[in-house]
Amino acid sequence: MKPPLRVVVVTESFLPQVNGVTNSVLRVLEHLRAEGHQALVIAPESSGGITEYAGFRVKRVPSLEMKGLLPVGFPQKAIEPLIDGFNPDVIHLASPFFLGNYASRVAERLDIPTLSVYQTDIAGFARHYGLTVAHDSLKRWVAKIHKRTTRTLAPSNWSCEDLKSTGV
């Protein structure tokens, strides 16, 4: 029997927000629990945010909440000792942006493999909401994060092709 894995899950979105990223993270955590693994979740602070899910601790980090938008978590130095103290085998980055970018850098410093999931077209959202000028910069930012990770998963052919178009 294999020893349980220790997984840090860093997510840009978590309960009480309900969306594709949150739902995917919940399924990952439920699977980790069912398989006897250990996990720690790092997520943005949010009004009504829970501090435990499936028996796993959810560590909330300061965030900016704006009406109608997801809370944006702020990377902070306290994340590194939290990750280091948990001694993970892998860091799972769920739709990485600000927190995920910081966690990927921590993983590099601590020599911890990372798994990122590309499931939010942040640049596309920017274009949709009239921030066309930010599109290319956001595309490069997200690509840079995924290029840094050990492995990237893409949940659809479209997202896979989108990543490939940026050199990932």
Regions found by a protein language model. Name each.
Residues 1-60:
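N-terminal subdomain of nucleotide-sugar transferases
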Residues 25-28, 103, 159:
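Hydrophobic residues within alpha-helices
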Residues 47, 98-99, 158-160:
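Alpha-helix capping/helix-boundary segments
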Residues 65-105, 109, 136, 140:
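An amphipathic, basic-hydrophobic alpha-helix
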Residues 113-115, 122-144, 154:
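Nucleotide-sugar donor phosphate/pyrophosphate-binding loop at the beta->alpha transition
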Residues 147-168:
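A short, active-site helix/loop in glycosyltransferases that binds the activated sugar's phosphate group
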